[in-house]
Amino acid sequence: VQRVNAANHRMDEDDVIDHILTADAEKIKSTLEGIDRAAFTKAVDLILGARNIYILGMRSSAILAEFMNYYFGLLFDNVRLIRPAGGSEIFEHLMKVHEDDVFVSISFPRYTTTIVNATEYVSKTGAKVIAITDTLSSPIVPHSTVTLTAKSEMASFVDSLVAPMSLINAMIAYIGKKKHKEVTETLGRLENVWKEYNLSLIHI
């Protein structure tokens, strides 16, 4: 309720489009200016060297996890998306985590106790943890091997995921560049399947 009231106080109906899009653009700019490029490169290297890649995001961050999982699935054969069906079920999946694995923990306000606990649990296994979050004061940061931050301050009651999505997009593109040959082969096979089974909805 406080978020709705605060958003309504900041902008009139006629200003919503300008306010939201401008605020989102500023978040991407601020994220770019503050990005730790060494941490970004380290995160990519950890992912490239992982035995398995586990991804978890909860609440609205689950969308980011799904996006990452979809494209990582084109880049790797060892990706495991943990869907937050319930607290105990999450830990059942995490029991399989090995020290040679990487766990990507995606969490933005409001943080959930479950993902904080899950991140702490994985860190104790010796696996590498990549935290994608809003600030270095996020509760998942103390349990991470490397942290990437993206701005997500809310201009309305809706969580702004534009900057986090852009950061993940950059990570996918960077990994794709490093795995250019494999990506080209995968996409080539995928296009052949589309053509063979007429799966493309748009023909140019």
Model-derived features: positions:
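Conserved small/polar residues in nucleotide/adenosyl-binding loops
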Residues: 202-204
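Short, small/acidic-rich helices and loops at N termini and domain boundaries
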Residues: 195-198
